[in-house]
């Protein structure tokens, strides 16, 4: 279990995450500074996390590159919505995770749902305003009681499904933790499932 603590007005809000897999996702049109992607991979890797990311351009591609050049290649899965992409990705484990014959839109959505069901937490780099794919990843993670760190300047609107805490992730990126209510009650994510 990994403890995350977020400074709040009267102390800290802390929650534990099973150190399973961290999912990196975000905009197909965004690119990350390689130092950001490598820094996050290194920090989560040292905590014992394995990694999930997608096969798309943009944020996925930034993390695939960082992961392929890291010490954590053996603990990485790239989830692909299109079988031909699994053959193009070299040096990193890629897996075709949706049924054949789906429309591209449906295949991408199913791939996103596959990843969010298998991660312990989501680190999301959406466009502003948030795109459909990032919105689906966010909602799916929250509905599956997974904490989400959203790298954005725009504070997500708090709902009954999650609380929002402004924070910084490892001194690398600023954003907001979106925490499902189960964490507030127990502090433990694995009790949610």
Language-model region placement:
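Acidic/glycine-enriched connector segments
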Residues: 2-19, 28-175, 181, 187-190
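Residue-level detector of conserved, well-ordered beta-strand and adjacent loop positions
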Residues: 25
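Cysteine-nucleophile amide-bond enzymes
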Residues: 193
């Amino acid at each position: 279990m990994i403890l995350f603590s977020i400074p709040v007005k009267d102390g800290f809000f802390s929650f534990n995450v099973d150190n399973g897999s961290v999912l990196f996702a975000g905009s197909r049109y965004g690119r990350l500074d390689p130092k950001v992607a490598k820094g996050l991979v290194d920090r989560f890797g040292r905590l014992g996390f394995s990694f999930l990311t997608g096969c798309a351009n943009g944020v996925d591609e930034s993390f695939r590159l960082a992961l392929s050049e890291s010490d954590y290649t053996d603990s990485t899965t790239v989830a692909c919505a299109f079988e031909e992409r699994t053959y193009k990705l070299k040096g990193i484990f890629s897996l075709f995770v949706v049924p054949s014959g789906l429309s591209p839109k449906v295949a991408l959505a199913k791939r996103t749902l596959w990843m969010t069901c298998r991660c312990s937490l989501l680190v999301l780099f959406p466009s502003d305003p948030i795109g459909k794919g990032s919105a689906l990843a966010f909602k799916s993670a929250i509905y599956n009681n997974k904490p989400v760190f959203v790298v954005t300047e725009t504070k997500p609107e708090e709902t009954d499904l999650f609380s929002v805490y402004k924070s910084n992730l490892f001194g690398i990126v600023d954003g907001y933790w979106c925490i499902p209510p189960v964490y507030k009650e127990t502090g433990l994510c694995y009790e949610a499932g």
